[in-house]
Swiss-Prot record:
NCBIfam families: galT_2 (TIGR01239), PRK05270.1-2 (NF003629). This is Galactose-1-phosphate uridylyltransferase. It is an enzyme of class 2 (transferase). Pathway: Carbohydrate metabolism; galactose metabolism. GO terms for molecular function: UDP-glucose:hexose-1-phosphate uridylyltransferase activity. It catalyses: alpha-D-galactose 1-phosphate + UDP-alpha-D-glucose = alpha-D-glucose 1-phosphate + UDP-alpha-D-galactose. It is found in: Cytoplasm. Pfam families: GalP_UDP_tr_C (PF02744), GalP_UDP_transf (PF01087). The lineage of its organism: Bacteria, Bacillati, Bacillota, Clostridia, Eubacteriales. Signal peptide: none annotated. One of its GO terms (cellular component) is cytoplasm. GO terms for biological process: galactose metabolic process.
Amino acid sequence: MINHEINKLLAFSLKKGLIQEDDKIYSSNMLAGLFNLDNFYFEEISDVPSTATAILNQLLAYAVKENLINDTVAERDLFDTKIMNCVMPRPSEVINNFNRLLNNSPKEATSYYYKLSIASNYIRKDRIDKNITWKTPTEYGDLDITINLSKPEKDPRDIAKAKLSKSTSYPKCLLCKENEGFYGNINHPARQTLRIIPLELNKSKWFLQYSPYTYYNEHCIILNNEHIPMKISRITFENLLSFIDILPHYFAGSNADLPIVGGSILSHDHYQGGRYTFAMEKAPVEKEYSIKGYEDISVGRVKWPMSVIRISSKNKTKLINLAEHILTSWRNYSDKTQSILSHTGSEPHNTITPIARKRNEEYELDLVLRNNRTDENYPLGIFHPHNEVHHIKKENIGLIEVMGLAVLPARLKSELALIKENLIEKKKDISNDSTISKHNTWYKYILDNYKNISEENIDCILKKEVGIKFLEVLKHAGVFKRNSSGLSAFDKFINIL
């Protein structure tokens, strides 16, 4: 069995271009050594699978049976990455292939690199495919909703082992370049299948890789050569526009650089990008402005639940100058009527989530105004999801959510299934069920507003209402509200520019 599965993996790796014919003996010996085999022979494989998942599952079952590993998620992940490492091309080979294709076509280069990242199982597509996704139509466009099931639950045995393992500071974080080829441990994922592509952005060294948890098509991470903190500045705009010069079919954006309104990793400067059109990109400009000194740059307020200024021009330098001017002005802007205070003492609150793209041969920047202030009423953040939406989403609203893609917690899968049962049975109250009592107010709203709930329409109803809740989340995160007071305050800010 093991001999046959190794042959299947070799055939798969040849088919996907991970190895060449001349690499077969080398890779087979690497695999035989990994499994402590005394001998190996080649077989003809007629039916080559399209993914490595089934082969890896068979090889992992053998490793468990032979006591090479314990049957836990973490140990299986560490070991299957070791397996795939035996059939991986060297980093220099991947870089050379990427750059050769890039000279001809940026789309071909990223397509090659993305397919390689999936074939190598670095992007665990079998897990990502478990995510529950749908679109919810709203007045702001179709919002993308994802219930994130791709990160498996931690095994108690792995948790216990992690407590006993020695903590190390290498690599310093999950985004450091030193992750490439890293063997991994119980506290840090193996990255032997990671290949990173060096890029020069604005005369500084960066790297391109794909996110192992792709939330949208070709979801990439652009990471700084140095382990330095996130900082939104003029350099950010220069780097983002430099990136879309290299890969004009991608967008690139940055999380904000302050807690609450930033992403989950603020310690390592990085951006995210990819080949996907979000609802925010499709959202129209609802009001145009002219800014003195920048009359030749298009400036507009985007029709979006959060507060977005869209600027566009063919002149990259002028666009960067205006973006910097808006950022500097916003950093020090306060409007008490909208609960916006730029500082508490010396602590700054205002920042921007920027997104760059090319549209009709022009550079375009969406600048999303953010504020991370807290108060007694909103201890988690005034412009952060409020209590009434925490049953659906209470985590930070980062770059991906800002653009209109909800990444919702895995718990919702089972909770929505229970809510569905109760709604079909027309139960008046769910406050006694500890698993879903947090949804009680929302549950009653659905019960009151939909008179003919049935098996046939319940899924559509719940998907629609979850999407509407996410829209509410985005409205909470908007600094200028979508009412007459908020929109006139938005105009007031733009007029001071």
